[in-house]
Each structure stands twice: as C-alpha cells, then as structure tokens.
Curated annotation (Swiss-Prot):
UniProt KW Zinc keyword: yes
Record motif JAMM motif, residues: 178-191
Amino acids binding Zn(2+): 178, 180, 191
GO biological process, one term: proteolysis
Record Pfam families: RadC, UPF0758_N
Annotated protein name in UniProt: UPF0758 protein Moth_0536
Xref: SUPFAM superfamilies: JAB1/MPN domain, RuvA domain 2-like
Length: 229
C-alpha cells in the first residue's frame, strides 16, 4: 500500500469483505456497517473501509446522523472527502425517496401497523429515541421523524420540537413512539405524564395524538390500548 492510499476492502480476508458476503449470502445478510463500507470502498491509512463505516455508525445517532448530515459535516469525519460525501448523500437521498414513496401508501389502522414500521429498527437502539409518525386525514403515513435521543422527559419532548415536523407536513394527527433499550416496553410514569402533556398540546394545535407506542425487544405497548392517553 502506498502512503497516500487508504486501506481497501480487497485487503481484508475474503470472509470479511462485504461485497463478497453480499454476493454469497444476499444483501439482507449484511450489517449496516457492511453496506456502508461497500459505498465507501476505501478507508484511511490506518482503517479499512469497514472500520470507517463502523466508526461513523458508532455515535449515539448512528444512521440518523448520516441521514441528516450536511456535506460539510460528512467531510469533517476522518476518511470522508468531498467525493465520498457526495456519493453518500446521493445514496441516502435515493433511500429517502423510496421510503417516502412506500410510506405514502401505508395506512395505519391499529397499533400493530405502527409497530410494523418501527419495531425492527428501534428494538436494537442502545439509547432512547423519540419519534413522531405523521398522518393525514385518511390515516396515511406522511413521514416518520426523529425528535430526540436520550431518556424521555418533558425537556426532551417539548411540544415545540415534537410538533415541528408534523406541522411542516400538514399532519392531521400523529402517533408518538419511543424505545426502551432495556427491552421492556412497560410505560413509566414519566412516559405517561409526557404523553398526556403532548395530547393537550395537540388539542391546542389541532393535531390529534392518536397513540404512543413504547418499543421493546420484539414487543411493544400501546398507551391507547391501555387507556393511558
């Protein structure tokens, strides 16, 4: 390897090369880091592309950071130049457009429909993530937005932040959701208090809070079904 080149995926053992694993086992078998490494192609002088990918995803926001980062913010990460930053933004934008197209056809009829959108991803998060699912008057999903990362409390779940994206999307109603990293979806008193405060704020804003789902490890709790709204 020359001094100016990064560590390439080809320099990894065959069983660790994401591209080879994709061809052998299929794209669904790859982790987020492996998928990202394929896009990056090369790493730095001391890190493989897979190492760089793992580092980028190791922060508290993980994929959410990549989804929301600007070109400048991406270039501040070691191993990411302008070309790689542009390629990542393009790939993420394609994914966002596909997700928006898919979500626009999704109708929410019950809490299980919402859990189907969120459970597989949120069950593995190692910090609490609070999200809103915005709906139109036909209960079709307009979008899913991340409100905060960290233990749910009244300061993190301020109505101004919670309703910002639903207002932008002209939502008629929202469903709240957050995960419990412990895996136990039992609502705490703080969860219930925050939810009721947001229900009241929704009444004032004309955006109904239909439910609040708490995501655990493979299971969830609906505050509406428990009559806790």
């Amino acid at each position: 390897m020359t001094g100016g080149q990064g560590v390439t995926i080809k320099e990894l053992p065959a069983e660790l090369r994401p591209r080879e694993r994709l061809l052998a086992a299929g794209v669904q078998a790859l982790s987020n880091a492996e998928l990202l490494a394929i896009l990056l192609r090369t790493g730095t002088r001391t890190e493989s592309a897979l190492d760089v990918a793992r580092r980028l995803l190791s922060g508290p926001d993980g994929l959410q950071f990549l989804a929301g980062a600007t070109l400048e913010e991406l270039q501040q990460q070691k191993g990411i130049g302008l070309a790689k930053a542009a390629e990542l933004k393009a790939a993420l934008e394609l994914g966002r457009r596909l997700a928006a197209f898919t979500l626009s056809r999704t109708v929410i009829r019950n809490p299980r429909d919402v859990a189907g959108l969120l459970l597989d991803e949120m069950r593995y998060l190692d910090r609490e993530n609070f999200r809103t699912v915005s709906l139109n008057t036909k209960n079709q999903v307009l979008g899913i937005d991340n409100v905060s990362v960290g233990s749910l409390n009244s300061s993190l779940a301020h109505p101004r932040e919670v309703f910002k994206d639903p207002i932008r999307r002209s939502a008629a109603a929202i469903i709240l959701a957050h995960n419990h990293p412990s895996g136990d979806p039992t609502p705490s008193q703080e969860d219930i208090m925050v939810t009721r405060r947001l229900v009241e704020a929704g009444h004032i804003l004309g955006i109904e809070v239909l439910d609040h789902l708490i995501i655990g490890d493979g299971r969830f709790t609906s505050l509406k079904e428990r009559n806790l709204l």
